[in-house]
Amino acid sequence: MSDSDDYLQDDPDDQAFDDFADVASSPPPPKRRRLQARNQTRNTTSRRNEDNSVASDSDSFVVDDDDASKTDELPSPSQASYHFADHPENEASSKYKIFVPKRNNPQENIFVTQLTQPPSPPEMIRGPRWKKPDPPPPPPPAPTKPTPKTTRGPGHEDYGDDEDLDAAIAASLASFEEENSRLSFSTAQNSPPAPVASDNAPTNTAQTESFDFLDDIPDDAFDSDLSLTPPPPAPPSNSSRPSSFMQSSNRPLGVRQTTLFNMATRNQAPQPPQGEQVFAPPEKVEAPTQHKLNQEAISTWVYPTNLGKTRDYQFNITQKGLFHNLLVALPTGLGKTFIAATIMLNWFRWTRDAQIVFVAPTKPLVAQQVSACFGVAGIPRSQTTMLTGEAAPGIRAQEWQDKRVFFMTPQTLINDLKSGIADPKRIVLLVVDEAHRATGGYAYVEVVKFLRRYNQSFRVLALTATPGSTVESVQAVIDGLEISKVEIRTEQSLDIREYVHARNTEVQTFKNSEEMVLCMDLLSKTLQPLVDQLRTLNAYWGRDPMALTAYGLTKSRQQWMLSDAGRNSSFGLKGKVNAIFTVLASLAHGIDLLKYHGITPFYRHLLHFQGNTDGQKGGKYQRQIVQDEHFKKLMNHLSPWTKNPEFIGHPKLEYLKQVVLNHFMDAGEGSAGAEGASQSTTRVMIFVHFRDSAEEVARVLKRYEPMIRPQVFVGQASAKGSDGMNQKTQLGVVQKFKQGTYNTIVATSIGEEGLDIGEVDLIVCYDSSASPIRMLQRMGRTGRKRAGNIVLLLMEGKEEESYIKAKDNYEKMQQMIASGTRFTFHDDKSPRILPPGVKPIVDKRHIDIPEENEEQALPEPKRRGRVPKKPPKKFHMPDNVITGFTKASSLAGGSKRTAQDKRKARTPTPEPVDIPALEDVILTAEQQRELEHRYCTIGDTSPEVIRTPRTDAFPRLQLVSRPTKVVKHGSLTRRMIDALQKMDKTSSDCEGRFKEVLALESRRPAEESLIHQSISRPGNKKRLRKGRSGQPEPRLPPSRVHEEKDEDLDGSQPISPEQLLSSFTDRQGPKPFSSSPRSENLELDADFEAPDLDTLLGRR
């Protein structure tokens, strides 16, 4: 007997209910009616042939023939209204009231996994819920041949005999496979294969029932990505067994997709590994690029596999960096250089002659990136160069003409762009290292702005470990570099967690030692009088001298100077306040050294402060501090302490010594003696803020050589008492640290950014930094290849609070940057560059490194015997610019007038000026007397008479300009002198010669005579014309003057003598006719007077 039989016979509740149905004439419950309706639609033939077997599925109740008399068969829903009509107790009333609907329609079971509406974000207001109406009932299936079933014993259930459930599952899988085929990542589009039908299931029935069942299942029930809109469901094929599920052709995004029954599908086509994503370049409408592209190479992009296993985050970031202006924020040591080298390699392949530029803020960083790109990307060394400011401009110009890949500092790049040495239109890729510096007016920002003026088709890749500490600083980086997308990873990101080793961070806080408390007490008593004076003047509100800071004093000084008291105070009071502020600000730095770095740096600072007061140096208040009794007592205490080599002036320094010693002892350092001391297996790096602190830490650790071999690592600038390190020395220290010559580096901020110092097992932060950028740069130096330790040494109070603030700020900023909701990106300035329709496919392969790249020397330009000359400055013209001059009317949108619209204005003929009579011009006798009496005579005790200048006096001196002091000669004076010089050159026989010339011209034919030609032209009687040589043409000979006067009696104006004389000049030049060999040798008498013009022209 099966479990179903036991359920029907042994359940006392069911038997009581059957007895009550017979007595109360009530219909069966709805559950029994639904089960009976489903049983009637099944194939009843197979059930009759099973004598000793029962269908054990959960939706049917079938009993044996022997037990039929014991159990009443349930009526069908269609017979519910008349099944108990002939029962004798049908009319008896019952105390149980059961609602019986008048119309009953058989309904199939509905499996609902999700809502039927399309997916939508949670913040959107949804509309009313709606369910698709039920389809019309299918026609009754045709009877099929019964299939024998295997008889099983009690307790065995066959869950695969429900054809409806199998068909529904097959239909759901068909829809799921159709969705996966549409989202295929492979290039070949293969339609999913049809499912194989089972032999023991009816074909037509399965098709019909599965179709009805699929209508009630939501379209997106099996979608793995809600951002994709599901396609309409395809007609499913027949399937009766879960073992005959269709095979998926793809799996989106490498996620393991399973069915409702926890069964995974298998893919036939090859697909990307788990975690890798495929991105296509964005489709944009833009002008074609000016770069020459390699049409054969742009169909694929190369991903090097030289370094072994492919990292998913590097693959995905590289793919986005090829097609977008990308800001990459990765923790230190996770392969930002590999990403940059891969992107540079692909753009090198895609273009024929375009140039690629990698910029880094310092020269050591530039040299480090060169070696990394040579060994990873395989870019030929012959096409690569490293340019710095040390190279001559002529050499740099030659390199810009011949090479394609450049490694340089941003300052050198902007200088070459502005001078015209570099062509901005040829640059296709700009890689920016340490991109968090690209704010304000830094060289990175200037380079991008300059390139954008001339080039609209270039890509930007920005690399950094921490983009910024505030929203404003991150937005400034995005604006300065025109970033369109951000890829950020933290140490908690899932795709990089396996590549980041554990880092144990230990935070140790300290209190002031007894020596430090004594020093603070004495210094506080020394500075208290000056602080009280500032408080009396309301210039500073603090009371404790140990709370002084340089920044606080500077702000207080500015506020006091801007206040009414500061503006209205006397100059003496202003000088006093400024002097006190200056002295206190100088000692505020020493207070920080005492609190956070140690007594020895503090003592060095006080010695320098005391040395500035020797003799007459230093101000009044500075000498007042040095001569104070508490200051002298303080110096007497500090001097013997610092001279003791065993003295340690800060509790942090004592703890630092113990931590470093324990680390090297645990690692077995120094156990091999002096011979094995140079082969270190572990490294330690200590970060400090000031050089004095670095030297003090190195002094303490050098006591334990050779176990601890420390080396100070500082910047290039020289400071008081400390010389800087040039770049060659810095690189040498780094190389020795990698080799094991030094196993401990005590570095300032120069060791925080960028430099590949190598694998470090222990990081000790001697002082805390309030900047999240500096904090993360420090902590990122360990935990790259193996587990690392970080020890933070903090003083209680301000330093501890600064660390907590920096840590919280970093975590908050990483979340905001990853979300991208607080920032504005520049997608419009991120061009596609590639032609439309081109979608490169990844080509993972091993890159063959050229033999020339194995050379260890940097690719700097070789020194030449003769340095080439700097080329002339070249001005690059932006695209689509308007050359030439443009009128303001055209800029304002006005229409351009053609030449035909312009009408030439007719110039009127000038009328001759009437010559007034001589009597009207010359003063009368009465006017002359009035002039002399009123204007020429000055009445005084000694009358003075002002006379007109005499032109006849000093004739030789009037031919030249006389020297002046204040008032220079006017234009009239210069003209007068010029006229007198010309008159002086006139010879004595000019009258005779003029007559001869005029006589010769008058006897010539009319066609050749210049006089006749000038008179025959129209208008010559009234105005003066000039000849071709620019000289006035002669008018009339003297012999015909009176004849022309007779002809002009009709009212025309006669020619004046001056006009007639001026027409007789030589056409060949300014030399007058008077110039002759005979007249040049004549010497004029002193009393010679030139002839009158009227007399000259009137004589015949």
Curated annotation (Swiss-Prot):
The record ties this protein, via CDD domains, to: DEXDc_FANCM, FANCM_ID, SF2_C_FANCM_Hef
| Helicase C-terminal domain mapped to chain residues | 655-829
Amino acids binding ATP: 330-337
InterPro entries reported for this sequence: FANCM/Mph1-like_ID, FANCM_DEXDc, Helicase/UvrB_N, Helicase_ATP-bd, Helicase_C-like, P-loop_NTPase, UIM_dom
Q: Where is this motif: DEAH box?
A: 433-436
Q: What is its main location?
A: nucleus
Q: Where is the composition biased (Basic residues)?
A: 863-875, 1019-1028
Matches recorded under Gene3D superfamilies: hef helicase domain, P-loop containing nucleotide triphosphate hydrolases
- GO cellular component entries: nucleus
Q: Write down the EC number.
A: 3.6.4.12
Q: Which keywords does the record carry?
A: ATP-binding, DNA damage, DNA repair, DNA-binding, Helicase, Hydrolase, Nucleotide-binding, Nucleus
Q: Which PANTHER family does this chain map to? A: FANCONI ANEMIA GROUP M FANCM FAMILY MEMBER, FANCONI ANEMIA GROUP M PROTEIN
Name listed for the protein in its UniProt record: ATP-dependent DNA helicase mph1
List the source organism. Aspergillus terreus (strain NIH 2624 / FGSC A1156)
Q: What is the lineage of its organism?
A: Eukaryota, Fungi, Dikarya, Ascomycota, Pezizomycotina
